[in-house]
From Swiss-Prot:
Protein name listed in UniProt: Large subunit GTPase 1 homolog
Enzyme class: hydrolase
Keyword Lipoprotein: no
Signal peptide: none
Location of the protein in the cell: Cytoplasm; Endoplasmic reticulum; Nucleus, Cajal body
Catalytic activity: GTP + H2O = GDP + phosphate + H(+)
Known role: GTPase required for the XPO1/CRM1-mediated nuclear export of the 60S ribosomal subunit. Probably acts by mediating the release of NMD3 from the 60S ribosomal subunit after export into the cytoplasm.
Ranges of biased composition (kind: Acidic residues): 248-275, 293-320
Length: 653
């Protein structure tokens, strides 16, 4: 047995006294004192961004506390880059509250005594202040503005066009007129002169139905703005069709005359024959000359692409800008009497409501002549200034009105460096302004891409704009347009939900054959094709006026989706798609699929009488189709590397 130990009462008392001493207050320092050789004695000439941030926070006395149980559920809609209903309502409210700050730059006051250098300096200062206001609006209010023109020279061209024009026409896209309309431009026109008139020309109006055009006409009527619905491409096709019909009629007349001439040659004598043919030839020549003269009188704008720019009727200005020298045509007449004749028509147009039908070229020119009633910038002449975004059809409108390609058509702003004036007829002059991108409010960048403001080929994230397309275009329209079958919603999802961007692009990529190197659908490439179809109008969505339900405004979505296939292949009865209304149940489909019921075995099979570990066994005579080969050969490695798409092909049905 060992030695008997004591009770250890003294040690327990010492431990108790030590614990009381540690818990009591003390005058000693409780914080760590950094020695002279510590890290704070080091020279800090260069610091990393993290070290600089931590040092600044330490000097400012900022403390960082870890946040726990900060759980936030992310909905499926937020992953698409789109706004929820509450967020969209909040953004629209902010847009309305800050609408008055969305202005265009003003030209400073000037007169005959203002020198050129003083005017340019004042313009630069005013433009710089305008840029600062927009930057403050984006930073402080957290609003998204469309890309706008930042070159002062283009705004100078706009100022000159407004000063020289009697009527300022804004050309907007019919699918979203409010996005391309600048209300502050209308206010600035009235600030320059109260005698000037504003008008909105809604281009691409053939994409709208009669009910949709009537709704927009009523909305702008309440706003007190004159609107005209116009389609440059449709009118150009109509005019070219009329020219072709005239050419066909002239060719038919020539053929009929030649047939009559040949029949007369068979009946008459040879001498009379020659005389009649000579007279007929002269008659044909005279008729052709009359036909050419009629064409020249009816259409004054023959194809003159080879003409130089100096041949156009252009206006030039001096350095001060107080004189307007125009090279008018020689045949220009005084329009004072004609203006007095149309004075009554102008008063009637002011009282008549906005009409909703598509106007033709002659009707549009008549509106230009009769809209302005006050004193004009130049006596006996109506100057119409055309202003608009790029890619809204401004150049196409000018070319259709003139009947010739006078202006280059381009979707890139900056093609036209200087404004130019083009005479349509004596007394009516079009003043073409360079394409300007004016500041406007948008909710997301996806909206700018779908509106054609941002280039599609330069986008980096394709999911938000494609998700916006899926929200606007119904599932059946997408399937009928591209001939695809988009995957159905699952059993636990809403059967009427919109397709996602991944579902649409996957189906489109499989159909077009746009695949990546790994055998998967190329979604970014497919997204560019779909977005270009949306911008061009193949996938049509029209924004309604404020206060109208967007879903009930889409009359074109109510049409039969098989109409395109019927027009392309004739009146063939389309096959009924039995899977269109089925809901995909992945569990049931995988369970009851017969291709999934299979048995797998690993190892060498008992063939040719060999079985591992049992030696030679009696095997019935194999048939010709069951002979596999030598069991010791590793033929099982064949087709080992299979593509995932080929293996899971049965899951796509």
């Amino acid at each position: 047995m060992g030695k008997k130990r004591g009770t250890g009462l003294g040690r327990s008392l010492q431990r108790q006294r030590g614990s009381e001493r540690r818990g009591a207050s003390s005058w000693l320092h409780a914080s760590e004192v950094v020695g002279e050789s510590g890290p704070e004695r080091r020279s800090a000439v260069e610091q990393s961004p993290l070290e600089e941030f931590l040092a600044t926070a330490e000097l400012a006395g900022t403390r960082f506390v870890a946040e726990r149980l900060n759980i936030q559920f992310v909905s499926a809609q937020s992953r698409t880059g789109l706004l929820t209903a509450q967020e969209a309502q909040h953004v629209r409210q902010l847009h309305e509250e800050n609408r008055q700050f969305l202005r265009i730059p003003r030209r400073p006051y000037w007169d005959r005594t203002t020198s050129s250098e003083d005017l340019k300096q004042a313009e630069r200062e005013s433009f710089l202040e305008w840029r600062r206001q927009l930057a403050h609006l984006e930073e402080e209010k957290k609003l998204i503005l469309t890309p706008f023109e930042r070159n002062l020279e283009f705004w100078r061209q706009l100022w000159r066009v407004i000063e020289r024009s009697d009527i300022v026409v804004q050309i907007v896209d019919a699918r979203n007129p409010l996005l391309f309309r600048c209300q502050d431009l209308e206010s600035y026109v009235k600030e320059v002169s109260n005698d000037k008139e504003n008008m909105i020309l809604i281009n691409k109006a053939d994409l709208l139905s009669e009910e949709q055009r009537a709704a927009w006409a009523q909305f702008f009527e309440k706003e007190g703005v004159k609107v005209v619905f116009w389609s440059a491409l449709a009118e150009c096709r109509r005019l070219s069709g009329e020219v072709k019909e005239l050419d066909a009629d002239s060719v038919a007349d020539d053929l009929s005359d030649s047939e009559e001439e040949s029949s007369s040659q068979e009946e008459d004598v040879t001498a009379e024959d020659s005389a009649e043919s000579t007279s007929t030839g002269s008659a044909l020549q005279t008729e052709n000359q009359c036909l050419l003269s009629d064409d020249d009188s009816s259409d004054e704008y023959e194809d003159c692409e080879d003409e130089e720019e100096d041949d156009w009727q252009t206006c030039s200005e001096d350095e001060g800008g107080d004189k307007v020298n125009a090279i008018a045509p020689k045949s220009m007449e005084n329009r004072t009497d004609i203006v007095s004749m149309h004075h009554v028509v102008q008063e009637q147009n002011r009282n008549v409501k906005n009409f909703s039908h598509l106007v033709q070229r002659n009707e549009l020119l008549e509106i230009f002549k009769t809209l302005h009633s006050g004193p004009r910038v130049k006596d006996g002449e109506v100057n119409v200034g055309l202003v608009g975004y790029p890619n809204v059809g401004k150049s196409s409108t000018i070319n259709t009105i003139l009947g010739d390609k006078k202006v280059s058509v381009s979707a890139t702003p900056g093609r036209t460096k200087h404004f130019q004036t083009l005479y349509v007829e004596p007394g009516l002059c079009l003043c073409d302004c360079p394409g300007l991108v004016m500041p406007s409010f948008v909710s997301t960048k996806a909206e700018m891409i779908c509106s054609g403001i941002l280039p599609i080929d330069q986008m980096r994230d394709h999911v938000p704009p494609i998700s916006l397309v899926c929200q606007h275009i119904p599932r059946n329209i997408l399937e009928a347009t591209y001939g695809i079958n988009i995957i159905r919603p699952r059993e636990d999802e809403d059967p009427d939900r919109k397709p996602t961007a991944e579902e649409l692009l996957t189906a489109y990529g499989y159909m077009r054959g746009f695949m990546t190197a790994h055998g998967q659908p190329d979604q970014p490439r497919s997204a560019r094709y779909v977005l270009k179809d949306y911008v061009s109008g193949k996938l049509l969505y029209c924004h309604p006026p404020p206060g109208i339900d967007p879903d009930g405004f889409q009359h074109q979505h109510e049409r039969c989706p098989e109409s395109r296939t019927v027009q392309a292949s004739g009146p063939v009865k389309p096959k009924k798609n039995t899977k269109a209304k089925q809901i995909e149940n992945v569990v049931d489909k995988s369970f009851f699929h017969q291709e999934n019921v299979r048995a797998l075995m690993k190892g060498v099979r008992a063939t040719m009488g060999y079985r591992p570990g049992s030696g030679l066994v009696s095997v019935p005579a194999p048939s010709a189709g069951s002979v596999v080969g030598k069991p010791w050969k590793k033929h099982g490695n064949r087709n080992k590397k299979e593509k995932v798409r080929r293996i899971t092909k049965h899951l796509e049905n």
